[in-house]
């Protein structure tokens, strides 16, 4: 189990590659973002995106899964106080392979909850061509292993 002390600035967690499947793009869009470019190949080709494209929210959800698989599920996480920024830099198309990493930007002990550390991270998702498709700046609240901890 990882604790706050395991998150010094500069620590990096790599994401395992994830294939963007057409059926998943369409299913997500049908439920949460029913726009033509997300619902069919023809709708995607007719758009400026050039093909069946994942919703930005779907891209964010895939990023969240990559975060969980790379470190969160093995961390004494107490959730997140929020996302500072979420940028969708390039269309994510059906058939793309996504990977990337997240890096600790800053870590400090909470002033109001001394047993909790606030860890700020930046996640960057890239496609199979190495192009950045999404960037997210966010924070995690992570339990400290010891009182008076330093990351």
Locate predicted features.
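Hot-dog-fold acyl-thioester-processing enzymes
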Residues: 1-82, 147-151
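Conserved interaction-surface patches within small, structured recognition/assembly domains
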Residues: 84-86
